[in-house]
């Protein structure tokens, strides 16, 4: 945004650094669409409903900005994933990791790297066939549930899925990436 390469931005308030990014971008006035999505710290039913509402408000805000209707079919197609070959890997946990850092780790360790941070990709446990028949509220609730069911960052309070990771026979090591001043 600051370099003029993007004029639409959705940020997730995963940590204080993202809130500061939002403040800086907002102060420049260079972003035509700027939205902060609130991410809960918990993954209980109440938080899932609240998060689904936040996602729905994002959808409505973007529709109003872009004057385009939400494309449910395109949304659902974004969840199709090809079957991945199982092989040994190093997991990267912690705060977001850039592709450059992922490549550097892989080049130095000579093993596949799985980015298990919040920027690690779309590994969502949703069934596109089921979402096709849902109304919009149910679909966004299923989406919120799937997002909150991903590998939790260390900011999230429920660590059960992190504990399950250690049982993966393909996991050969973990690199925990952190930054100073994360909440």
Predicted feature descriptions by range:
Residues 1-183:
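An N-terminal assembly and electron-transfer interface module characteristic of large anaerobic redox
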């Amino acid at each position: 945004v600051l370099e003029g390469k993007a004029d639409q931005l959705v940020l997730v308030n995963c940590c204080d650094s993202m809130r500061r990014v939002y403040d800086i971008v907002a102060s420049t006035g260079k972003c035509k669409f700027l939205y902060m999505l609130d991410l809960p710290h918990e993954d209980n039913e109440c938080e899932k409903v609240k998060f689904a509402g936040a996602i729905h408000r994002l959808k409505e805000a973007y529709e109003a900005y872009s004057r385009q209707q939400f494309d449910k079919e395109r949304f659902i197609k974004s969840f199709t994933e090809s079957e991945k070959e199982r092989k040994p890997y190093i997991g990267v946990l912690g705060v977001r990791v850039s592709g450059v850092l992922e490549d550097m780790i892989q080049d130095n360790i000579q093993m596949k790297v799985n980015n298990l941070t919040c920027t690690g990709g779309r590994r969502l446990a949703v069934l596109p066939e089921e979402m096709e028949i849902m109304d919009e509220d149910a679909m966004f609730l299923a989406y919120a549930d799937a997002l909150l069911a991903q590998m939790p960052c260390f900011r999230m309070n429920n660590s059960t899925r992190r504990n399950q990771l250690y049982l993966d026979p393909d996991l050969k090591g973990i690199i925990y990436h952190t930054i100073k001043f994360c909440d």
